[in-house]
Amino acid sequence: MRNKAVLDLHLVSDSTCETVIAVARSAVEHFKSLEVNEFVWSLVGSKRQVDKVMLNINPERHNLIMYTVVDDDLRKYLKEKATAQSVRCIPVLAHVIREISCYLQVTKDPNAHPHKLGDEYFNRIDAINYTISHDDGQNLWDIDQADIIIVGVSRTSKSPTSIYLAYRGYRVVNIPLVCSVQLPVDPATIADKLVVGLTIDADRLIQIRRNRLISMKHQENCNYVSYEQVVEEISEMKKICAKNRWPTIDVTQKSVEEIAATIIQFFNRKNNRTGDALY
């Protein structure tokens, strides 16, 4: 069996590195035979910081720099340093910016600085804090401040999906639905909110719950993994969602990212939005 090629991938940005990380990870997904060591260099805003990045590049290894740097002088300096060390340097947005410029015959804004630590950054932090404090049905007194409400039985990815959405800027409340226990909030009070129910195949849910019990050393909780109990829980959840006309998502074969993307589509449709994020 052939050994995997190893790449030291240096991701450089004068901002948060979110864009270059997303592009880089999407790209390397196409190379299953590649082993990648990822180095993230965010908030690189001076030549001294560029020098620090370059000093940490091992010349004995395969190296690649992917970057988003707005400042022309700093970008030029980074490319010069990379060339001097024979390191390939790829600007991840240059081609897209150039295509837009050529197509519309407009020049890019020289003062543009994506992802500045402005309102959008602090709004996202606020969304994360709100979502964490409203996990698992907590603090429902200010549920009216939520953008999205997620409901579902235990172990249907409500919490990780909520956190993922919060990172995108959405304020999320997630509420567990417990069989024979009344919904802790009056549906009439959240009629104007997007409420999404997460459902799942019963056999898959039992498997997830059983693994959870093993990890917590609580295997004696038989009802939690009882087929009849699980089927009843899922059925009751579907009835509640149908009664209140809340959309549902079957998460059996879906990743958190896919679940969140579907919820964002619901949100955009409800609010007549065409983008996929609040910012």
Curated annotation (Swiss-Prot):
Its EC number is 2.7.11.32, 2.7.4.27. It catalyses: N(tele)-phospho-L-histidyl/L-threonyl-[pyruvate, phosphate dikinase] + ADP = N(tele)-phospho-L-histidyl/O-phospho-L-threonyl-[pyruvate, phosphate dikinase] + AMP + H(+); N(tele)-phospho-L-histidyl/O-phospho-L-threonyl-[pyruvate, phosphate dikinase] + phosphate + H(+) = N(tele)-phospho-L-histidyl/L-threonyl-[pyruvate, phosphate dikinase] + diphosphate. GO terms for molecular function: ADP binding; ATP binding; phosphotransferase activity, phosphate group as acceptor; protein serine/threonine kinase activity. Keywords: Kinase, Nucleotide-binding, Serine/threonine-protein kinase, Transferase. It holds the Pfam family Kinase-PPPase. ADP binds at G152, V153, S154, R155, T156, S157, K158, S159. InterPro entries: Kinase-pyrophosphorylase, PPDK_reg. HAMAP family: PDRP. PANTHER family: PYRUVATE, PHOSPHATE DIKINASE REGULATORY PROTEIN 1, CHLOROPLASTIC. Bifunctional serine/threonine kinase and phosphorylase involved in the regulation of the pyruvate, phosphate dikinase (PPDK) by catalyzing its phosphorylation/dephosphorylation. Belongs to the pyruvate, phosphate/water dikinase regulatory protein family. PDRP subfamily. This is Putative pyruvate, phosphate dikinase regulatory protein.
